[in-house]
Design a protein with these regions (language model features):
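A cross-kingdom marker for long, charged
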Residues: 331-342, 347-390
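Sec-dependent signal peptide recognition
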Residues: 1-7
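Post-signal peptide N-terminal segment of secreted/secretory-pathway proteins
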Residues: 77-113, 129
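Local sequence-structure signature of Cys/Sec-based thiol-disulfide redox active-site neighborhoods
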Residues: 18-37, 224-233
Length: 390
């Protein structure tokens, strides 16, 4: 399920497209004495692997983002949406062909989608101690976890005017699930292995930035004649209306049955993080969340955005007590499970990212492959079993 979940997300929008000028294309990075080698350089010999281009072209799903537009699913989506050619429609290409100049558009999401148009920093970044000057010349500073997360989320979640909205999902686009550390590892990573502390910070920053960005999207949709359903938990509507439904058995504490529920997946993970790092902000978050599905949604979303932005800046600079965060998630797993499949996905990826036994999460990923069969009690039992093996 882990691979399936990530494949679905990569089949959809991927990474944000910066300014349309200055791209050189992936081939410009493929020199054998730069990033185009066939084997990784020994540790200590170079700060880079040297075979990043091969990693991307052979194993990275980003390299097949253009291809997704030409396959049966992509063609059928274009037909349903009334798009003549998805490979030339900005709604699709803004993310599926990010980082590729026109002449190499079939490369899909290439190096410069993540690292920035390289025209002015390609030569600079080969020199020692050149990172800061390269960033000033247009390189995206992926060492900065907030910037890295925002770069990914611009397409793996969306920003105003560039998003997978309900129309696209209804036409066949997969819903987007994203967690920074899990997706970085599955890309696959084309850098030296990172210390656990850095990976844990990546998870924390990714959760905080993801929540802030989702709240900005929610605010951008306010005031429209109808809600943007992609802001919501999908399966509150897309489920069987059977009398024995777990939703009916659970009840609707604090809201009327049928009230639309904002997707709370990242809220629950940030709750767990605040329980460990900033308890004083936890109460503020809970108060704002209580008003997300009311007439004061915009003000509540703004308050949550502020909390999440502050948290992202804070956790980028400090180590995370991963075990304590996992205890906070596990202690609240019933409520997380009751929030639905999207929240369960984030809890699973959190256990994968912060735990010590990745294999133990496999049954959780397998279970979430079939969201129509999802039952909170079953997910809770599987999560507790996997958590006990960490």
């Amino acid at each position: 399920m882990r691979e399936a979940l990530i494949l679905l997300a990569f089949a959809g929008y991927t990474l944000a497209q910066p300014a349309p000028h200055g791209y050189i294309g992936a081939g410009g990075c493929a020199s054998s004495n730069c990033h185009g080698g066939t084997t990784a350089s020994p540790v200590g010999e170079s700060r880079i692997l040297g075979n990043e281009f091969a990693h991307w072209s052979v194993s990275d799903k980003h390299a097949r983002a253009y291809q997704a537009l030409t396959e049966p699913r992509g063609k059928r989506m274009a037909e349903v949406l009334g798009i003549a050619d998805a490979t030339h429609d900005k709604r699709c290409t803004i993310c599926h062909i990010a980082g590729s100049p026109e002449k190499t558009r079939s490369d899909g999401v290439a190096c410069e989608a993540c690292h920035g148009p390289a025209e002015h920093w390609l030569g600079l970044h080969t020199r020692q101690n050149s990172h800061e000057v390269s960033v000033r010349a247009g390189m995206i500073d992926t060492k900065n976890l907030e910037i890295r997360a925002k770069t990914c989320l611009a397409c793996h979640l969306g920003v105003p005017g560039q998003e997978v909205d309900h129309e696209l999902i209804a036409a066949g686009h997969p819903d987007l699930a994203f967690e920074l550390d899990t997706f970085t590892a599955a890309q696959p990573a084309h850098h030296r292995p990172l210390p656990n502390a850095v990976r844990q910070r990546a998870w924390a920053v990714g959760q905080a930035v993801g929540l802030a960005e989702s709240m900005r999207l929610l605010q951008s949709h306010a005031g429209k004649s109808s809600p943007e359903f992609s802001d919501l938990e999908c399966y509150q509507c897309h489920h069987d209306l059977r009398s024995e439904s777990w939703r009916i058995q659970r009840g609707y504490a604090g809201r009327k049955p049928g009230t639309l529920q904002v997707n709370a997946a990242r809220i629950e993970m940030v709750r767990a993080l605040l329980a460990v790092l900033a308890r004083e902000d936890r109460a503020t978050l809970d108060s704002a969340v209580a008003h997300l599905n009311s007439a004061t949604t915009v003000a509540a979303a703004k308050a949550i955005e502020h909390i999440a932005d502050s948290l992202a800046a804070r956790v980028q600079k400090q180590d995370i007590d991963a075990a304590a965060v996992l205890r906070a998630v596990a202690g609240n797993i019933q409520r997380i499970a009751d929030d639905g499949v999207n929240a369960a996905e984030q809890a699973t990826m959190t256990l994968d990212a912060l735990g010590t036994n990745t294999e133990a999460t496999a049954p959780l990923y397998d279970y979430l492959e079939h969201p129509s069969l999802y039952r909170p009690s079953e997910f809770v039992a599987l999560f507790q079993k996997a958590a006990a093996k960490q």
